[in-house]
Amino acid sequence: MSQIFKERNHFYIRICEGYVLPLLLILHDHQYFNNIQFLELITVLQGIIRNHFKNGMGLRSTYIAPESASTSKPIYLSDIGFTIRFAPTYPRYSIMVKNIKPQENRNEPIKIKRKETIYIDNKVKDSINNSNNNNNKKDKKDKNKQNEEDHLIIDDVIDEEIQEKEDNESDSDKKKLITKITTTTTTTIPTSSPTNIIDDNVEVIETRFDKEEKEREKEKEKEKEKEEKEEDIDILNDRAIALAATQEYEDDDVIFIKDDNDNDKNQNQNQNQNNNNNNNNNNNNNNNNNNNNEGEEEDEELPYQGGMYKGLYVTGHTMIVETQIKVAGATTLISQFHVANEDKDADDSDDFDEFNLPDTESQLSKSKQKSPNVKKTTTTTTTSTSTSSRKQSKSKLKPKSKSTMATNNGGISLYFKK
């Protein structure tokens, strides 16, 4: 029943000068996996890692070549067997570690501010720009709804005020007109009932005409005020979006993918929207072209500048090692994964000169075939003694009921860091 369970351990292997490789170690029957087997596994992995990162593409890119990502490669050692493959670090195996300031109270939970990034076809897409487009569309819809609602509310309020003002003005106008009419009638026309009726009719006609003109003028003023309010709202929204973007870019705690367009942040929103729409259309066209031309090579991708782990850059590839039950009579030469000193090319990068793990080809090769032209050296004698002592130590060791990785991890800490 112990073979059913698995133990997953996440480690970081330091390679080159300033890089770290995420390792996902999946153990079957982990109770019998001891420290010696772990060290033996490390010596094999160093050659595989060196060969994989020989061209340097895996350090700064998430693109996996078909030969390295097609199937898992089985390798069998003296006691255990395992399969190995590489996978993109992001997004499935996300190792976006942030630089966090040291806290006074370590027991408090750590709050990490992060800027989301989206990888589409191995290309980085900034989620802030995409979210701005959606937010702008939503804001426009909300504005229209608010303007319609505000329009109804404002009309209701203004109608009451207008009625009161008009009533007051009509009363004052009536008084003025009555005073004028009385003065003119006293001088020219004698007072009589027919003249009073005519004057009353004239007064009513004048007040209605004035009301219609006033209503038209007020409606024009309302439209102007609404247009000014909409412009003010657009300006405020633009400022809020710009402030939000600058705060995220200026935050020292956040590690994000640096773009070359940092100087163009203060452009108008219309230009940004047009550019984003064009980019989205181009991305859709590129996706369609990639789907139609699956056999063709992909276009150039942006360099992978992922997270940091204790000041070291996390590589774009994650190594996945899964132990398997050893098959009787099945062997795979380890030398095909190991890069010998003779195979070194002059085009190799300088970063690999400072490879931390020891280059021990004699320890890795366990085949009995030896070339007759090769002479024995001190290295071969030391390896023979080391292998004999290792066999003696293995014969003395017995499987334990508990895993020794949790207790005896002194050798593990030399190569891996959790």
Swiss-Prot record:
Composition bias of kind Low complexity appears in: 266-293, 375-390
User: Which region ranges are annotated with the description Disordered?
Assistant: 123-174, 209-231, 258-302, 344-418
Bias class Polar residues marks the residues at: 359-374
Amino acid composition bias (Acidic residues), ranges on this chain: 156-170, 344-356
Basic and acidic residues bias: where?
A: 136-154, 209-227
Q: Which domain of life is it from?
A: Eukaryota
Q: Basic residues bias: where? A: 391-401
**PANTHER family, per this entry?**
MYND-TYPE DOMAIN-CONTAINING PROTEIN (PTHR16148:SF14), NF-KAPPA-B-REPRESSING FACTOR-RELATED (PTHR16148)
Name of protein: Putative uncharacterized protein DDB_G0288959
Q: List the source organism.
A: Dictyostelium discoideum (Social amoeba)
